[in-house]
Amino acid sequence: MPVSRRALLLAPLPAALWLRAALAADSPTAVIQHFYDVLLAVMKDAKHLSFDQRYQRLAPAITQAYNLPLMTRLAIGPGWAQLQPAQQQRLTEIFSRYTISVYANRFDDYGGERFEVDSSPVANPNGLIVQTRLIKSDGEKVTLIYWMRLDAGGPPQVIDVYLSGTISELATRRSEFSGVLQQGGADGLLKLLEDRTAALRTG
């Protein structure tokens, strides 16, 4: 039910708190923290979960945190414009499944790990940078940096991840995909991603 202006004026503090909470829920750090919360919960339950169960639990959090359609286009690079719409859609679908499968395969156990998320993202002309760390049980820290983009009408979403703080996952994918596209076209890339996704599921 709509809230009247008079009601908001009579109770400005609760309205202000509600607005602040709503904005905070869509902040870059909140998006990453929610993703990590889901990921950590899956890791803790992993011994009792099949690959498919881990996939199903992770999929909503990943599709919410990651802009997978844009990541697909950026990973393919200039060749994207030469693809037919049906090929673009199919590649987006399989790239999304592949990305989720990587997480479902990789995070299949829990050994006391935890995640830290810096509270203040860093703005740059191309988006927002959120720095995080995976802290292993022995104290070793692995830096994971998320490059996020804010599009109108939605919360910020990840478009690239820098492993160990320096290795761009997007650049790695683009380098690999460009050779496959040159040799086998869209069908060759589709087959590569389908084969890798299947291997992650059974591996």
Specify the residue positions occupied by each region the protein language model found.
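Surface-exposed, polar/charged faces of alpha-helical domains
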Residues: 45-49, 82-86, 112, 187, ...
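N-terminal secretory signal peptides and thylakoid transit peptides that target proteins
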Residues: 1-14
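Sec/Tat signal peptide C-region and signal peptidase I cleavage site
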Residues: 20-24
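Early exported N-terminus immediately downstream of N-terminal targeting peptides
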Residues: 27-103
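Surface-exposed, charged secondary-structure patches
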Residues: 100-142, 193-196, 200-203
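Low-complexity, intrinsically disordered terminal/linker segments enriched in charged
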Residues: 162-203
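Short beta-strand edge/turn micro-motifs at domain boundaries
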Residues: 143, 147-172
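Solvent-exposed loop/turn segments at secondary-structure junctions
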Residues: 80, 97-98, 136, 164-168
